[in-house]
Structures are given as C-alpha cells and as structure tokens.
C-alpha cells in the first residue's frame, strides 16, 4: 500500500473511532453485579491494587490500550498519551507499528510515546503476520517493555485493502520463542474463545489481551470506509468482553488483560474480579482526549484509580487476590451463554 494512503487510513481510524463512540458499551458488564458488604472491616488506605503481568510489575491494574500512530496527527496523540501514562503511572500500548517498519519517516509518530514516558511501561505493537525480525525492530523502536501482537481477522476481512491470508500461529510461536520481552497476543474488539486460547497456549503464549466486543468496533469503522457499506451485518460479531473473560477462566495458566468497552471503574473492578490481571481502555480515553484535553483526561484516569480503590473497599478486599474471590451475580443471558459453552461460572 502507498505509505501516504496508510497514514491517511490511520487518521481515518482516529476520526471514525470517535464517530462511532457510544457512552454506553455493549461489553455486558451491566449484566454482572457485586454483592455489597456492609461491614468491610478495612480502610481505603489498606487497598493495594498492584498487579503482576508475567515478569512486569504494575502499580496500577489499569492501562492505556493500543490506539494509533503513523501520521503527524497521530504522533501528537501518542505524545499526549505518553504524558498521560507518565502522570498516572499506567502502562501504555502503541498502535500498530506496521507503517513504521516500512517507512522510517513514520517512526517519530510512535517514538513520541516513549519520549514522553521515559520511565514507564510501554508496549510495542505489530500484526500477527510479521516475522521475528519485525517484532524485534518494533520493540527496539520504543525501547518497549513488552510486545503486543494483534490478531484482527474480522477487521482485515471488512477492510477494503485488508489481508486475506491468516496463517498466523507459526509467526506468533516464533516471536514468543525469540523475544526477550513478554509477548501479549491481543484481539481488537471481537473477543477470544477457549479454542483460540488453547491454540495460543500450544505455541507458548502466556499473556493475552481478550479485546472483547463492546468498545471500539472495527467492523463498523472499516465497513464505513467501503463504498457500498454492505457488511453491516457483522457489526455484532464476536464475544463480548465479559463472555471472553468466562472463556479465559477455563485456561488458568494464561494471564489476561481485559479490554473492550471499559467505560468506568466499576467495569474495571468486575473484569479484575473475573480474573483479569490488568484492565485496559482505549476508546473512552481517546473520546476524553478529543472532547476535552490532556489535563482533563489525566484527571479522569486518576479518578478511576480512586474509584477502583473505593469499590474494593466496599467489598472488603485489600488486594486483587481477594477481589478475585468475590462471587458476582450473573444475568440469565450470561448464565445461558456459560451453560451452552460449558464454562464454569
């Protein structure tokens, strides 16, 4: 693809992600309820929500998920995200670096993320069709602490100029074996089923980002870019974030990041209770950044951290291990899903 067209597509994605943003997500967190504890017997200051993701220690179990890069406009956004990550103590993931692997002129639009967050956790990001050499280059480009490999079959098939060949597992296994940083395999809004998770485990994957349905919808975005816009029947394709979390509970050796439709601290708390080590948000953060400014978005994410501590205090849980022991009440729809999929709930 012509590189200027690739950069234009990145700008399109940014604009369309905001166009299709909805304040109410369809990730199904509203179909889960905690049981209130009137006597928690802890104080707010007792709560320690630090977490571990593979060898990485995170003081905050929230992260800024992969969004963008590849054009001057998106380079500015990445600089803002880097500063927000530094101010909030949150990990941050780059958008796909594919364009920067082909065109050196695009590299600064990604390195602005690290330049503005020199001491924080930064995750590189490439597609699953790339080889080990590309993976190492992406990590080196950002001095990254981990690499995300995104699997985005649904997006590619709807994208007019997208890939049509999806022999990815060998690439993923080779990269996991060759890299000296953790490798996270990431969906981009369509969720993961236990069959997928089993395949990933078989090639050595230990960390996954479930990327469930409910947040940014790349079928909607790519279909909008088609002349006929004829693939709208796929706009509900995939497993929700909550369904994906139940799928992942069948694979206890995998460590999970939950993303997809995280709109508030209560969503994050529910995801952590279902087993996620870290919870990520992209669309909500991008929406705040576009509609307000960097300072307001930073304040929002600091408020989320206070909110998560508040919820954990309400439940009488001082750490994430205790939070994961909380039983959640499920809607009939979720119970039905788990029963049909033979998932423990």
Swiss-Prot record:
UniProt binding sites for Mg(2+): 156
Key words, A-Z: Cytoplasm, Flavoprotein, FMN, Isomerase, Isoprene biosynthesis, Magnesium, Metal-binding, NADP
Record EC number: 5.3.3.2
Positions bound to FMN: 66-68, 96, 125, 186, 216, 261-263, 282-283
Assigned GO CC terms: cytoplasm
Any single biological process term in GO: isoprenoid biosynthetic process
UniProt entry tagged with the keyword Isomerase: yes
Record-linked CDD domains: IDI-2_FMN
Residues bound to substrate: 9-10, 155
Function: Involved in the biosynthesis of isoprenoids. Catalyzes the 1,3-allylic rearrangement of the homoallylic substrate isopentenyl (IPP) to its allylic isomer, dimethylallyl diphosphate (DMAPP).
NCBIfam families named among the record's database cross-references: IPP_isom_2
Protein name from the UniProt record: Isopentenyl-diphosphate delta-isomerase
Native organism: Levilactobacillus brevis (strain ATCC 367 / BCRC 12310 / CIP 105137 / JCM 1170 / LMG 11437 / NCIMB 947 / NCTC 947) (Lactobacillus brevis)
